[in-house]
Amino acid sequence: ALRESLEKQWKTEQEKKQQMSALAHDIKTPLTIVRGNAELLSETELTTEQKNNITYVLNGTTQIQSYVKQLIDVTKSWNCSDVTYTTVRLEDFFADIKEQALGLVEIYHQKIDWKAGQSDKKVTIAYDPMFRAVMNVIQNAVEHTKENGIIYIDAKEQDDRLTFIVEDSGSGFTKEALLHGTEQFFMDDTSRNGEAHYGMGLFFAKTVAEKYGGGIKLSNSENTGGARVEIFFLSSQETS
């Protein structure tokens, strides 16, 4: 009876994942149509009120597209067959993340305080999902930091464990966010623009970290007073 119950539960979970994956992809097409038509309308003669309405539509579709992308990333992370393991120099992996993070904060007129351990070691990792997971954590920090704020990133490796600590200079996690911030579709309103924010990014980061032998920890930084996220993964490693 226990075995049948577990098999039924597993089957139900698989069906939910398939439905979520299909839904995410199905949303993309009508969303693209809405955005495309809104962009066409914006090029016609409009009143001030109509222009404002079009702007709201475009901003809304941009936000939804971001959520859909994160949802697709999550569903991809469930599929082991899609993962390619790559052997890279640890310094190169850190450098790739630093480069993308610098490009991200530049858009929001922020700065990065970057610290990374020096190592000639090579690591074998699921590069793409791990890279996206770390960038989701950094994106979350960016969204909760005001212009001219600083994002602190500490990247290190020890005992076959890759760890990234990201601290922002925002208002920090609420009590509710500390408890539920990595849950799918968790919402808070502490983002930089004051709008409700969905926690898909941290949910995806947690999903990937746990899949590769690691985890994620949420806290508030003693240094900045902002949010602190520690994400880590296990990796096989060899000296060069």
Model-found features: residue ranges?
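Short helix-loop "hinge" at the ATP-lid/N-box region of the Bergerat-fold HATPase_c
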Residues: 141-142
